[in-house]
Amino acid sequence: MKQPSVKLRGGVAAMRLVAMRSVAMLSVAAVLLTAAHLGAQQVHNAKYPKDPAFAPLQKSDMGETINFTMENSKIYVGTSREITVYVPKEYTGKEPACLLVCLDGVLFNAITVMQNLISSGEMPVTIGLFVQPGVIYARSGEAGSSSKAGSGSKAGSGSKVGSGAGESCSGTQKRVQRYNRSNEFDRVDGTFARFLEEEVLPLVATLKCSGGQPLLISSNPNNRAITGASSGAICAFSAAWFRPDLFRRVYSSVGTFVAMRGGNQYPWIIRKTEPKPLRIYLQDGVNDAWNPLFGEWWEANQLMESALDFAGYELFFKWDRGGHSIKHGTALFPDAMRWLWRGWPAAVECGCSRNDMLQALLPEQQAAQRSQPWQRCSLTAEERALFEEACKSPMEAISPGGWSKAVAQKGSMWIYSYTANNPGSPDTEWENGLEFYYLHSAPNQIAFDTEGNLYVASEIGIQVCDHNGRVRAILNGPKGSVERMLFIGNRLIVESGGELFCRELRAAGSRNPFKEQLPKSQGQG
């Protein structure tokens, strides 16, 4: 009577064992299939529509290419770099041409695309300036690295950009002491833009075409675009961001907006900053992560897209399933150029941000006024006296109503806040000092408005902090950095680049805090 149950248990056990083996085999198969599927997906889309702008140029269609080595930089001391200039066949030398700067050399098959788009009338007559990053070679000339300097310019359709170093244009191998690419490209400041403005473009202006025509390049920022891939892309964005007086149109391919040298900070800086007159085309791949140590490129580009959209920029964002290469960026390059130059010569204009602090501060203006909100101004003798008086104590300010006092220090990202033990009295003593206001750039001068918001003149413009010590808005300085400032009513006067400028705001400055009404609380949120 027991035997059948024993057999039954044995049969069930065997069946369970077979089932477990089957499940295990299916699981392994599923893992292999999933891995194969993911491997297949982590590549660029298989096909792209062939754009006519990639059609090979006939000899009769081509313009002129000028190559040279640039040395003796004062900004990037000791560096050497290769530069290519392309002059389209339509250029006559009689009037200034537009400009396209491409970082890491000739990427995206750019010369062919440029010439075809210019010939078809889809792009204005544009001189191409292709700039490699700098390297410093050993004086001894000993053989060392065998790859070419700035080999990002040689990147194929599926190659990574900006890897490599070490051969002169003559082909003689040299030992590289320093690669300057990351230092030049990944920095979040206007240094590379200044390098282009003060050193590269003046040098290009000395060149002539084979027919003797001078190279005339428009100084109008609306006639200038800049592009790059990877670190070159963030460099292109930074050049336009910090110097919209130089560049207004940006193409970014697989941009390195990650934590290399502060690029990860851009999304929240963009959200807080008064919009600039820029038009931006972003490209990236879902699987873009050159080195996860620094962050996720795809995630960073999505944050950039979100921030730029919030801040009201003219923006186009395109992606595929690829990784960190320029295959997709190359395929999109013709459309990116068409989109960036569409409507030319109409000016690129400022959009309207959804930042509520900016909306509260800025008056409604036409697009042209938003692009140039500051006007040069001269002061009356009385205004000059007020300006100089305000600048005698640039690092202290008392809030309206006399309830708190802000004290800043040169070079510090923190501003101390003190509370009054006898609020509203000029004879009060100040107590409870704490690091309270946190800045994005060190202060040059501080002042309150009548609503109790703290204004901070700084290198990145005027930071505006709320009652709780947070920067909520950043007003662009007329020349970038703002050294000094003064409110006269709702007229804000600043010194920027050694010149005086003014603009009107909806806010008014606090002039006599102990006689002014205590502002409405902003709560603790």
Where are these regions (language model features)?
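Blade/loop signatures of beta-propeller domains
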Residues: 355-379, 423-426
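Structural signal for beta-propeller blades
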Residues: 413-415, 462-463, 500-501
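A short beta-strand motif characteristic of beta-propeller blades
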Residues: 432-438, 471-475
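Short loop/turn segments immediately following beta-strands, especially the blade-tip
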Residues: 417-426, 505-511
